[in-house]
């Protein structure tokens, strides 16, 4: 094994670099590989992921290599600034080199992440998660360099294009939020706060995860589950036949369970378990109260060190809302209009429940169940029957036609491109009068074993839009977890919620791949600084 060290300091005589003092080193073990093999990205072939030949070893090797390259590239840029600051062009000598290294890292990282999500047997957690964290740290290096930050601060942006000005703004905002305007003592204090926040957040998330998995309740009575939809029964069943039981209630299916469970005590029990996750009501070793207060205090301290009134005010630097006042005003206006209607709806729901035999006042664990019953009574709205109107293929076809018409696009399936699973399809996106694709979209719609489950799905950019990557089109993966078809004659049927998810994520994917900018820093989801 060849051992590559990341995070190693350079032995140069130059002013103290505070970000290096807080940077932690780490080690990546890379399989032996010749330099020629890594001259071009071995995970891609002909502009597309080389699915047939991708292995975990190749993923680790390639991502590790580009991690090294990126960190080395940031240091090279710093050295250039130190040695000849007055001879450098902002974009030719600073932005372009960072883009070249950054885009290669992002493209490799994105592909490896997609493979981890769609098949964590082929790319297991232990092989991916440590690399993911290291890539995340490496990517932040360019925003933690005082030399790079100060070089950006000293530039006259008046003659730059709008896109170039946005790139400069991105670096300035990120540098400011990383404490690069602070003096040495405050910078060191801010670094300690940042590290403490990361530690507290990790502990908080771990306790939430462990605590959430503690709750379980077994139902043996089929009368309770007789109105449960098939997908809920399948998610709960402890036997091969989801209709026979027994059934296990967990917090993973809490929302849907509250909608369908007719037993108020069972609803309350499950709701209370969800409410008490990692709280003072549970085991002491899983109580998050102290971590929550620590996170709040550290956030306040970080904001004050940077000169903000609160963490919320600091957060607005990277949000389209612009200010806390704008958010408060918007929420106030919405509340003023919506509250009378909400009160009217709650009164109506209470009356309906009482007329249907319910005694007492509706509580939070009652509302999902009675809301569903009321919709069924008033509008004959049954989510399960509505699914018959939304077979996946029909919805996707209609969505593609709508998007094509609205944006003057042509979206065609590319069956010749190999994918990681037969369910996954590839689509090329063209301008109507152009034969060269603007972008490529992988759509992997159905849940399956070894595929990471997220209810709302996710969009992963596997190759960003950036001039540094050349003429190859950007690529994104739209990964969803809809129920798989039972057979070729039984299509996957979507709920209205599923349809909303598909529309939302498809739009997010288009935002990723249809950028027309030159620079990764402001491409795709980077429209807002992060």
Please annotate each region the language model reported.
Residues 2, 10-12, 19-227:
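N-terminal helix-rich structural modules
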Residues 162-163, 167-169, 191, 196-199, ...:
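Active-site-proximal, well-structured secondary-structure segments within enzyme catalytic domains
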Residues 280, 286, 293:
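Substrate/cofactor-recognition hotspot
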Residues 284, 288, 388, 392, ...:
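Alpha-helix N-cap/helix-initiation motif
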Residues 300, 307, 403, 484, ...:
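Active-site recognition of the HExxH zinc-binding catalytic motif
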Residues 515-530:
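Acidic/histidine-rich catalytic neighborhood
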């Amino acid at each position: 094994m060849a051992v590559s060290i990341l995070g190693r300091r350079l032995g140069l005589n130059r002013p103290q670099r505070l970000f290096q003092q807080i940077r932690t080193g780490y080690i990546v073990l890379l399989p032996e590989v010749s330099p020629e093999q890594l001259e071009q990205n071995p995970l891609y072939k002909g502009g597309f992921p080389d699915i047939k030949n991708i292995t975990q070893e190749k993923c680790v090797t390639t991502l590790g290599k580009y991690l090294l390259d990126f960190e080395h590239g940031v240091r090279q840029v710093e050295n250039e600034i130190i040695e000849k600051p007055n001879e450098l062009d902002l974009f030719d000598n600073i932005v372009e080199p960072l883009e070249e290294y950054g885009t290669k890292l992002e493209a490799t990282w994105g592909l490896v992440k997609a493979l981890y999500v769609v098949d964590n047997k082929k790319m297991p957690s232990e092989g991916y998660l440590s690399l993911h964290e290291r890539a995340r740290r490496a990517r932040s290096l360019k925003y933690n360099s005082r030399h790079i930050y100060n070089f950006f601060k000293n530039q006259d942006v008046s003659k730059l294009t709008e896109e170039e000005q946005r790139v400069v703004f991105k670096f300035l905002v990120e540098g400011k939020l990383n404490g690069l305007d602070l003096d040495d003592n405050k910078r060191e204090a801010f670094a300690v706060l940042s590290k403490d926040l990361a530690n507290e957040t990790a502990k908080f998330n771990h306790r939430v995860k462990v605590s959430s998995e503690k709750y379980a309740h077994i139902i043996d009575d089929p009368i309770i589950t007789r109105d449960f939809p098939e997908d809920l029964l399948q998610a709960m069943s402890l036997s091969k036949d989801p209709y026979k039981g027994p059934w296990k209630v967990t917090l993973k299916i809490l929302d849907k369970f509250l909608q369908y469970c007719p037993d108020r005590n069972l609803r309350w029990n499950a709701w209370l378990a969800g409410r008490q996750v990692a709280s003072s009501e549970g085991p002491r070793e899983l109580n998050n109260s102290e971590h929550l207060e620590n996170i709040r205090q550290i956030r306040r301290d970080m904001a004050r060190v940077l000169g903000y009134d609160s963490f919320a005010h600091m957060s607005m630097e990277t949000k389209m809302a612009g200010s806390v006042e704008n958010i408060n005003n918007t929420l106030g206006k919405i509340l003023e209009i919506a509250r009378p209607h909400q009160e009217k709806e709650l009164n109506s729901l209470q009356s309906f429940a009482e007329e249907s035999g319910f005694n007492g006042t509706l509580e939070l664990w009652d509302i999902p169940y009675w809301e569903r019953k009321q919709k069924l009574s008033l509008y004959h709205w049954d989510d399960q029957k509505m699914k018959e109107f939304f077979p996946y293929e029909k919805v996707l076809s209609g969505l593609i036609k709508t998007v094509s018409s609205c944006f003057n696009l042509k979206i065609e399936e590319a069956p010749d491109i190999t994918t990681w699973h037969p369910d996954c399809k590839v689509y090329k996106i063209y301008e109507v009068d152009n034969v060269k694709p603007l972008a490529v979209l992988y759509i992997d719609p159905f849940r399956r074993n070894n595929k990471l489950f997220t209810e709302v799905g996710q969009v992963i950019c596997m190759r960003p839009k950036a001039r540094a990557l050349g003429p190859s089109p950007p690529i994104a993966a739209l990964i969803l977890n809809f129920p798989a078809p039972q057979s070729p004659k039984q299509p996957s049927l979507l709920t209205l919620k599923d349809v909303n998810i598909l529309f939302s994520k498809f739009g997010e994917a288009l935002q990723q791949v249809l950028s027309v900018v030159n620079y990764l820093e402001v491409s795709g989801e980077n429209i807002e600084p992060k």
